[in-house]
């Protein structure tokens, strides 16, 4: 009996010790993960400041925005140490060692390369010109016209509600207004939500968006125009109109532009087993305003930003 009691006591002590060790290990793991997350957020804040600087300096260099501009070049995943090594500031060997384990990637997207859903209303009325543009996009993508009608009706109702109905702030929230997840996924590459009326930048728009925003422009002609544009971006609306043939007669501001002021910045930091992604929308003005910002923490491998 005494032997059994002793064995049970030893087993209990071993169990308690193992439990304590496990809890300590988990605590260290949580602490390490939180530390990595905070470090990643700090790096992403620096990356966002850098992106705002790039956009500000770019605005000073000309009156057009196109896909050959420096901001349009994605940053493929690279070690942080590759940036520190080229810095003129003194960087310690210890810092470089840590930076070897940190990977950065990111890109800046022109949101005015897309149709702005906010444009569907003007005041508290539907905008006929913009509804027609979205109708062409819906038809091109094989989406029902009825879905667009519901979307416009809901937007008009929200604009007339005196604040009783909340307007979306993200494209992902357009399901509030009647779009199904499948319809939204189909539209997502071609639309945006910006809290002001915006024109489409003809220099950065895809063939699908050009077809939608320029009445009478066939998709095949839009595709040819994009190929020509890649060799020589359009400096003025007049140049763009000439390249779009007969349909170019419909090109005019402010619905069409060759420059942009609204951009999305996507940054990603991979640090150990922690990956943090941040998306921000910047309004390029005197203050480089951040319209909104969201972050997500992922575990394990992630897909490329491209």
What are these regions (language model features)?
Residues 1-306:
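Compositionally biased linear targeting/interaction segments
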